Curated annotation (Swiss-Prot):
Changing S10A: Loss of phosphorylation in G(0) phase. No change in cMYC-induced CDK2-mediated phosphorylation. Rapid dissociation from the cyclin E/CDK2 complex after induction by cMYC. Loss of protein stability in G(0) phase. Coiled coil: none annotated. A peptide sequence containing only AA 28-79 retains substantial Kip1 cyclin A/CDK2 inhibitory activity. It is found in: Nucleus; Cytoplasm; Endosome. Changing R90G: Loss of interaction with NUP50. No cyclin E-mediated degradation of phosphorylated p27KIP1. Residues 1-34, 86-197 are annotated as: Disordered. It holds the Pfam family CDI. Keywords: Cell cycle, Cytoplasm, Endosome, Nucleus, Phosphoprotein, Protein kinase inhibitor, Ubl conjugation. This is Cyclin-dependent kinase inhibitor 1B. Residues 51-91 are annotated as: Interaction with CDK2. The gene is Cdkn1b. The record marks R90 as: Required for interaction with NUP50. It comes from Mus musculus.
Length: 197
């Protein structure tokens, strides 16, 4: 039994449980600024977006909805795609969450990953034939491996044998003929640090 005492000034535990069950406390964040009127919030957001769009049209004399230039102080002209830096026309990178999803999808049931071609100096002659067989990197999740730094380029080691996990056994137990001799482990001790008695 414990030596915990409940003072007379505090309510008993039974009364506390009953009070919580009857009237659950409302969340403070829900009522901090009053109830949310979703219709009004949507109207305000749409109005704000329209105002921003109109201000941008006036400032840049360009109709961003229809992608057409308007009359004004700026003169818009078309340019060739090749004359622009690459970042203006390359597709956007997938979000980091997409990398995690692609990594999970590219594993088969046994846990091994599909073959992923290596890019640039990392590729050797055996890996280059994979690049020729792949139709389009946008359709293939493995083609996004160079864009997703979290994906592995080769599968994890399949054999996690006892090579990596060494057991420190005493010589007496190993030379012993008993069936459990190989399962005894002993914590290694530093040589030379013996107690002086």
């Amino acid at each position: 039994m414990s030596n915990v005492r409940v003072s007379n000034g505090s309510p008993s535990l039974e009364r506390m449980d009953a009070r919580q069950a009857e009237h659950p406390k409302p969340s403070a964040c829900r009522n901090l600024f009053g109830p949310v009127n979703h219709e009004e919030l949507t109207r305000d957001l749409e109005k704000h977006c329209r105002d921003m769009e109109e201000a941008s049209q006036r400032k840049w004399n360009f109709d961003f909805q229809n992608h057409k230039p308007l009359e004004g102080r700026y003169e818009w002209q078309e340019v060739e795609r090749g004359s622009l830096p690459e970042f203006y026309y390359r597709p956007p990178r997938p979000p980091k969450s997409a990398c995690k999803v692609l990594a999970q999808e590219s594993q088969d049931v046994s846990g091994s990953r599909q073959a992923v071609p290596l890019i640039g100096s990392q590729a050797n002659s055996e890996d280059r034939h994979l690049v020729d067989q792949m139709p389009d990197s946008s359709d293939n999740p493995a083609g996004l491996a160079e864009q997703c730094p979290g994906m592995r380029k080769r599968p994890a080691a399949e054999d996690s044998s006892s090579q990596n996990k060494r057991a420190n056994r005493t010589e007496e137990n190993v030379s012993d003929g008993s069936p459990n001799a190989g399962t005894v482990e002993q914590t290694p001790k530093k040589p030379g640090l013996r107690r002086q008695t």
